[in-house]
């Protein structure tokens, strides 16, 4: 039995397809969803959603929520991009820049540290979805 997955941002639907499995980056760790999964509502962190049909596809996301109900997974996030649509070299450069920025943040500036960590997670997700950090 197929699992219907929709990944939706405020301005577009990134994925609307039937898949065999989806792995979500929840706030408590990765969650694998198969057909027949129990109903679930979970917070998502910036990371990579992996969906499996005949092969695996990666989608980089920022924070949001996922709802699982009746063999349907609805993912509502601020931003999302399919790995195949992300330039690997640009993603690598952005990730390296975010790492350097975090290293340079004033340790006393808690907001700056949080912002830099958030940017690092976002750029890491894009780099991983594009095929980096294998």
Curated annotation (Swiss-Prot):
<comment type="subunit">
    <text>F-type ATPases have 2 components, CF(1) - the catalytic core - and CF(0) - the membrane proton channel. CF(1) has five subunits: alpha(3), beta(3), gamma(1), delta(1), epsilon(1). CF(0) has three main subunits: a, b and c.</text>
</comment>
<dbReference type="InterPro" id="IPR036771">
    <property type="entry name" value="ATPsynth_dsu/esu_N"/>
</dbReference>
<keyword id="KW-0813">Transport</keyword>
<dbReference type="GO" id="GO:0005524">
    <property type="term" value="F:ATP binding"/>
</dbReference>
<protein>
    <recommendedName>
        <fullName>ATP synthase epsilon chain</fullName>
    </recommendedName>
</protein>
<keyword id="KW-0066">ATP synthesis</keyword>
<comment type="similarity">
    <text>Belongs to the ATPase epsilon chain family.</text>
</comment>
<keyword id="KW-0139">CF(1)</keyword>
<keyword id="KW-0406">Ion transport</keyword>
<dbReference type="InterPro" id="IPR001469">
    <property type="entry name" value="ATP_synth_F1_dsu/esu"/>
</dbReference>
<keyword id="KW-0793">Thylakoid</keyword>
<dbReference type="Pfam" id="PF02823">
    <property type="entry name" value="ATP-synt_DE_N"/>
</dbReference>
<keyword id="KW-0472">Membrane</keyword>
<dbReference type="InterPro" id="IPR020546">
    <property type="entry name" value="ATP_synth_F1_dsu/esu_N"/>
</dbReference>
<keyword id="KW-0375">Hydrogen ion transport</keyword>
<dbReference type="GO" id="GO:0046933">
    <property type="term" value="F:proton-transporting ATP synthase activity, rotational mechanism"/>
</dbReference>
<dbReference type="GO" id="GO:0031676">
    <property type="term" value="C:plasma membrane-derived thylakoid membrane"/>
</dbReference>
<comment type="function">
    <text>Produces ATP from ADP in the presence of a proton gradient across the membrane.</text>
</comment>
<dbReference type="GO" id="GO:0045259">
    <property type="term" value="C:proton-transporting ATP synthase complex"/>
</dbReference>
């Amino acid at each position: 039995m197929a699992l219907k997955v929709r990944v939706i941002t405020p301005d577009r639907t990134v994925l609307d397809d039937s898949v065999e499995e989806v792995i979500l980056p929840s706030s408590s760790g990765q969650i694998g969803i198969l057909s027949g999964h129990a109903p679930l509502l979970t917070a998502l962190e910036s990371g990579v959603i992996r969906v499996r049909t005949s092969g695996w596809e990666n989608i980089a996301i920022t924070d949001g929520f996922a709802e699982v109900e009746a063999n349907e997974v609805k993912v509502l996030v601020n931003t999302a991009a399919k790995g195949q649509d992300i330039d690997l070299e640009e993603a690598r450069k952005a990730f390296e820049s975010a790492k350097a920025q975090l290293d340079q943040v004033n340790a006393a500036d808690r907001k700056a540290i949080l912002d830099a960590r958030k940017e690092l997670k976002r750029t890491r997700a894009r780099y991983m979805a594009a095929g980096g950090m294998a």
